[in-house]
Amino acid sequence: MSQEKQVFSIDLAGRQLTVETGQLAKQANGAVLVRYGDTAVLSTATASKEAKNVDFFPLTVNYEERLYAVGKIPGGFIKREGRPSEKAILASRLIDRPIRPLFADGFRNEVQVVSIVMSVDQDCSSEMAAMLGSSLALSISDIPFEGPIAGATVGRINGEFVINPTVEQQEQSDIHLVVAGTKDAINMVEAGADQVPEETMLEAIMFGHDEIKRLIAFQEEIVQAVGKEKSEVKLYEVDADLNQAVREMAEKDMHSAIQVHEKHAREDAINEVKKRVIEHYEAQEADADTLGQVNEILYKIVKEEVRRLITVEKIRPDGRKGDEIRPLASEVGILSRTHGSGLFTRGQTQALSICTLGALGDVQILDGLGVEESKRFMHHYNFPSFSVGETRPMRGPGRREIGHGALGERALEPVIPSEKDFPYTVRLVSEVLESNGSTSQASICGSTLAMMDAGVPLKAPVAGIAMGLVKTGEHYTILSDIQGMEDHLGDMDFKVAGTAHGVTALQMDIKIDGLSREILEEALQQAKVGRVHILNHMLSVIAEPRTELSAYAPKIITMTINPDKIRDVIGPSGKQINKIIEETGVKIDIEQDGTVFISSINQEMNDKAKKIIEDIVREVQVGEIYEGKVKRVEKFGAFVELFSGKDGLVHISELALERVGKVEDVVKIGDVITVKVIEIDKQGRVNLSRKVLLKEEQEKEAAKEENKQEQQ
């Protein structure tokens, strides 16, 4: 490969995409700088020279955000980037998933793919640039990668599909789809949608694949020009004689163990066979490498038999039919003090979701590379070790938990009511209590139940289902509601969430070379049937959102003030607003358009705070009549409080009809008198009159007396 800088360009969605090689990071096995519009991403690929002594492929994909890319300095005391943001973790997963299946079985060399985002143009996706850069860095390197792959974002505006939509277009789009794959097939889909029909989602996937083919052809040209020769790597293989011996010893018993229906009993039966075989070789003083190979052979026996049973005999590990869903059970309102809770159980998978409602000030503030600054709807997913009957240290959420939480959030977001209709921040937490496959989809079902229990007026209830596929040659079986073993040993994990009207989220990972359109179509339709079945079960537990919020949820009052008066409510250095909060114990959030949200558990305090704000922003008009309290008496007149924060002066000459010698002869401090606004001067001072009202009253009495005399 030439070390001179070379530049390659292609048009992508009306914007130029440029790839530069040979100048940066030349000690990596492969490195490219991808420029897309003003977005710039440096992608590198490196690999260890020797294979690692592990029983899996050690691939790490990192998508690294740098705040200098958007001209920001990190907050906090340290002033440098810390742990990856949620968006960065999701982008890393997005790149990892289509790349991972394209390394040969038995490849054990450690591979690290790093993409550093160096400049961001919001209309030109840094994730898509990083995906293309990661594929190219691997493809031009000497690492034995069977790519290239490419990805594309697809939107839909007014029924028309759009590739890599701009920020403005994304706001109008009812689909946000990321599709990735090779030139021959799709191997990864990640999508959010606004209740879009299955047929439309399939069309969008195929539309994205057409663009992928063009981007792969572009990459192949670059590989032809600057690619290194792939290195010869010895793949991990088990010894043929050992393979035969282990199979003769274990195959029959393992086949029987696999057909035990209950998860833990099946695992115990399989482990018993494994233990017997391992002990046999330990007695012969086999070394660690041999024992590792024995474990590998035993795993393959299980995998082959499970796949054969599903594809040929149409028997699933737990005895279900291909489209059969495990027994369902649901419950709501099981936690008294929470704002809403939902327990969803599907076979041996169980999720407890809790909904918490907060004021709009409780939104999550995002400090990243995107345009979005805050988030009022959140879904967090926790997967404790006890859910699978294991022990391990309790740490913060890993990549998988963040990914599953984001999938649930994407599935539910389209049905969350607008801020105008429901001025609350909504946080969902899904606790996985039991796991045997499809926990992310169980968390979606549990979250829907929790929000309905909390009284969130959802546009429609959402349910999710995980589909699987096992394909051997021309034989294939599509599985509804896959359990852990089917997910682990199958060829596809295809999660579909949505309402009765359409899809709201889709996530697909394929471990084989790819799927035909026909199989995808069949899987989507089978998923729809399963989803509707689950929805009907959920609606039998709670038919619609509760009409009243929990007694423990905050009550929110919305009011509108003149935007020019916002500064009066806040006061100098926030003194006024802090005084209201201290006096009433409420939370106050003010939007730039003058919308004010007052929230607390106590409705009485909300009303009190509202009255205070109304008084602050209330404007005095000439001609208005007030009943006010005398606050101060001077020689020239009396100061009267019309309402909180607003005083006016009744001059001594305006106190009474007759001449007044001393103000105190008519009023004293604390008296409540009725006054009329007669003038507001240029300095905003309010002049009041009691005399005018007394005169009007006198004239009314005189007119009444005159009428009385005429009638006599």
From Swiss-Prot:
GO biological process terms, semicolon-separated: mRNA catabolic process; RNA processing
Subcellular location(s) of the protein: Cytoplasm
Gene3D superfamilies associated with the record: GHMP Kinase, N-terminal domain, K Homology domain, type 1, Nucleic acid-binding proteins
Claim: Transferase is one of the keywords in the record: yes
EC number: 2.7.7.8
A GO cellular component annotation in the UniProt record: cytosol
Short name of any one Pfam family annotated for the protein: RNase_PH_C
Required cofactor names: Mg(2+)
InterPro entries: ExoRNase_PH_dom1, ExoRNase_PH_dom2, ExoRNase_PH_dom2_sf, KH_dom, KH_dom_type_1, KH_dom_type_1_sf, NA-bd_OB-fold, PNPase
Occurrences of domain KH (ranges): 554-613
Binding positions (Mg(2+)): 487, 493
S1 motif domain mapped to chain residues: 623-691
Catalytic reactions of this protein: RNA(n+1) + phosphate = RNA(n) + a ribonucleoside 5'-diphosphate
Keyword list, A-Z: Cytoplasm, Magnesium, Metal-binding, Nucleotidyltransferase, RNA-binding, Transferase
Gene Ontology molecular functions: 3'-5'-RNA exonuclease activity; magnesium ion binding; polyribonucleotide nucleotidyltransferase activity; RNA binding
Enzyme class, first EC level, given as a word: transferase
Main localization (coarse): cytoplasm
Family note: Belongs to the polyribonucleotide nucleotidyltransferase family.
Function: Involved in mRNA degradation. Catalyzes the phosphorolysis of single-stranded polyribonucleotides processively in the 3'- to 5'-direction.
Official protein name in the record: Polyribonucleotide nucleotidyltransferase
Gene label: pnp
